[in-house]
Amino acid sequence: MTSIAVIGPGAVGGTLAAWLAQKPDHVVTVCVRTPFEALAVETPEGAISATPRVATSPESLAPVDWVLVTTKTYDTDATWTWLDALVGPQTRVAILRNGVEHVAPFVGKIAAERLVPAVVDIPAERSAPGRMLQRRNGWIKVPVGPAGEAFAALFAHTPIELHVVEDFVTEAWKKLALNCAGAVNALVLKPAGIAHDEGAAQVMRSLVRECVAVGRAEGADLSDDLPDQVIAGYRAADPGSVNSLHADRAAGRAMELDARNGVIVRRGAAHGIATPANAMVVALLNAAAL
């Protein structure tokens, strides 16, 4: 038996928890603020459901084999309340978050060989606690090594593609290029289909060009045509698909703006690279949240 705890079972975390629980020898716990009776996910393969253990407090928890951290980056402090109870000497911790700073908050507190940063592209939306819509099977990428390979094995029974990659830095910045463009959706409160509007697409390209410049300075191998690749991906997606930044702004929740666009501004400044487009959307979305 493999014990797995998922901290923050929102759209992506809840979807992953449901898939993990489809394997009988996985014992899954979800760590939540708002309890629910079961997980129910509409997936491209059909509906799946699961009844993991639902924990609303870490008090009764013990260390597990795996912890999946799927909370937003601004919830790191709250995440430690759970990690203190769930992490033992052999526990591995996978960090499934947006951005390129996955492990930084955990270095020095959890042994590096037991940390697995993960880049995730699984379009999913949560309609209520425990209820998700997964629009595409999607993929997860983790660094090469024993921990990354062990993490990939957890999903061998699922249709989600798992890739163990040599150059994780490049993969993380490629995903950030996709995420940073999504700020346009949050600004105009329109789903993926807005990328068919050439004016919106040009703003998206500007955001991605800055991401490419900063990512290269950080050591990522990013192609010149990445902005066009990102737009093509948006245009090929379900036009009604809503990214998490858009969903959070529409719902009046805190936005993961720093991890998706602010990091480009911060890292750009450190390298002397101007990032006016990303700085502008950060300023506008911060103002919109006032």
Curated annotation (Swiss-Prot):
NADP(+) binds at residues 8-13, 98, 124, 256. Its EC number is 1.1.1.169. It is found in: Cytoplasm. The keyword Transmembrane helix does not apply. GO terms for cellular component: cytoplasm. It catalyses: (R)-pantoate + NADP(+) = 2-dehydropantoate + NADPH + H(+). One of its GO terms (biological process) is pantothenate biosynthetic process. Substrate binds at residues 98, 179, 244. Keywords: Cytoplasm, NADP, Oxidoreductase, Pantothenate biosynthesis. Its main location: cytoplasm. It is an enzyme of class 1 (oxidoreductase). GO terms for molecular function: 2-dehydropantoate 2-reductase activity; NADP binding. It holds the Pfam family ApbA. The active site is at residue 175. Pathway: Cofactor biosynthesis; (R)-pantothenate biosynthesis; (R)-pantoate from 3-methyl-2-oxobutanoate: step 2/2. The keyword Protease does not apply. PANTHER family: 2-DEHYDROPANTOATE 2-REDUCTASE, 2-DEHYDROPANTOATE 2-REDUCTASE-RELATED. Catalyzes the NADPH-dependent reduction of ketopantoate into pantoic acid. Belongs to the ketopantoate reductase family. This is 2-dehydropantoate 2-reductase. It comes from Caulobacter vibrioides (strain ATCC 19089 / CIP 103742 / CB 15) (Caulobacter crescentus). The lineage of its organism: Bacteria, Pseudomonadati, Pseudomonadota, Alphaproteobacteria, Caulobacterales.
